[in-house]
Amino acid sequence: MEPVFEGADISWEIRDDTLYLRGKGDMTFLRDEEKDRLDIPWYYEDFTRVSFEGNITSIGPEAFHTSDLVEIDIPDSVEHIDALAFCSCRSLEKVRFGRHLRSIGGYAFEDCVKLRRVVLGGCVEVVDYSCFEGCSSLISFETSPVLRSVGERAFFGCSSLVRISLTEKVLRVAGNPFAGCSSMKEIEVSPFSSVYSSADGVLYNRPRSVLISVPGGTEGAFTVPDSVVEIGRDAFHGSRVASVVIPATVRSIDVAAFKDCRELRSVTIAHEEARHGVRFRDRILKGEMFCGCSSLEEVVLPEDLETVEFGAFEGCSSLRTVRIPASVERINERAFKGSGIKEIELPENLEYLGPMAFESCASLESVKLNEGLVTIDSAAFRGCSSLGEIDIPESVVEIEADAFEGCTGLRKAILRSSAIDPGDIFPEGVETIVPDSE
């Protein structure tokens, strides 16, 4: 048998389609600086099984990444599985976890698309970020009785997983680890938990002031309870809800809260007389909040909003009407990219229009730019093939060269700013009018 590297306490060989590992201690690898990756000696070898001998205490990072493993028994001596250890083992169907395993690193079993059932060992305390992300065949997951931490995106896209139970030992759930679990009906929490709770299968913090996760299989109308003051990151991500009612108690909605809710048609934000709907934290509509909501048709934004963050309405292909309040100063990258809006009037206080802000809005026919706008960034209107005319106000001092690239329907551009050289800004054949030179 050969050592994993010179001086290592673990050696290896392959016989009859099986990788044999023998030794003691942690499995570590040297870094191949020339190839800029870990030097895993069996990386290019073919095997479908692994046999452990001795007292190996960890499985190293990327140890079996993209291998053809079909099943594996992790010995009781192993206490930790490092990041990416079994990532993209697309033939892996069965894993038996050892009794003394304590933690599983990020992306460890990501994209193991044939893995169907997981029963964690009795000592597992940490399931890290994206650990089982993309395990689309996973139908059953039994947690460890001592599990205390579930990382962000730990089960993202586990589209066959129907339910999951969290014991009272769980003290940390990062973001919404169950986003994109399109078949999930229930997240169950032990009634003895001091940190989390569940009602009708929905995950909340213990006092139910923070909505953490609406199961992806939730359909139809959903009313956020009056106890909720915050809707967390990815809370509805990928769910099948058609409508959501948000009470006046809610003061904050976080990043990607409704991302990829493809059946979502309406979001109603209630308000008290003294308040004007949700006061988005820092007056910011968070990034990707409605990204991919392809059935959403109309949006009314709160009057005190100042920033529309990245990708907020990206891919909202049914969205036809948006009124942007006068208070908005920034529209960031990809904010409305690929949406179905037909016309847009930029608010009077807008100073910044980010890259790709309205890129690929193929139905966009009319744009009114505000006096006060300073920059039109890269690809801001690229691919807006229905746009026929554009009037650039005097305040604009910079337009990126590809801002109007692919605007095949553009016939006329009025350029009021003396700071801009029309050059190659507009597509060939566009009539460019500079009023001062008339």
Indicate residue ranges for each PLM-predicted region.
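The feature captures the LRR N-terminal capping module
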Residues: 1-19
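Structural signature of tandem-repeat unit edges
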Residues: 15-26, 45-58, 67-80, 90-103, ...
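Short, mixed-charge aromatic SLiMs
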Residues: 424
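Intrinsically disordered, low-complexity segments enriched in polar/charged residues with Gly/Pro
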Residues: 1, 189-191, 379
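Conserved, function-critical positions that sit in or immediately flank catalytic
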Residues: 427
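Consensus positions within tandem repeat domains that build extended binding/scaffold surfaces
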Residues: 60-63, 82-85, 105-108, 128-131, ...
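Short Gly/aromatic-enriched secondary-structure transition segments
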Residues: 29-43
